[in-house]
Every structure is written in C-alpha cells, then in structure tokens.
Amino acid sequence: MPKLKTKSGAKKRFKITATGKVIYAQSGKRHGMIKRTNKQIRNLRGTNVMFKSDGDKIIRFFLPNG
C-alpha cells in the first residue's frame, strides 16, 4: 500500500509540537480590521493549542507523516 500524502493546505496551517499537540494561528486577521476593536485585534495575535479530539483528527487525516 502506498504512503499517505500530507495535505498541503494542512501543513501550512497546523504544526505538531514535540508532545503531540496541534497548534494553529488565530483566524480573522486578514481584512476587515476597521470594524473590530483594538482589544479584539490584540486578542487574535499568536497561536492556540487545539483541543485533543480535534487535534487527533487533524493528525490522522491531514498530517499522517507529521
């Protein structure tokens, strides 16, 4: 059976940590900033850790070689 390919869109959006957690960047910072408050924009910075159940699905289906 051939190896599973990694989804190229997923490898750009998600990163697997050394402990096996999945981290991702916050969404909603590309355009339309004028209608958001400074607090909302500030809170969208940085990365988040995905819930374990969702992270396991990402690894299994989209990042099999990750």
From Swiss-Prot:
Q: Which SUPFAM superfamilies match?
A: L35p-like
Q: Which UniProt keywords apply?
A: Ribonucleoprotein, Ribosomal protein
Keyword Ribosomal protein set for record: yes
Q: What is this protein called?
A: Large ribosomal subunit protein bL35
Q: Which PROSITE patterns match?
A: RIBOSOMAL_L35
Pfam families linked: Ribosomal_L35p
The UniProt entry, under InterPro entries, shows: Ribosomal_bL35, Ribosomal_bL35-like, Ribosomal_bL35_CS, Ribosomal_bL35_sf
Q: Which GO terms describe its cellular component?
A: cytosolic large ribosomal subunit
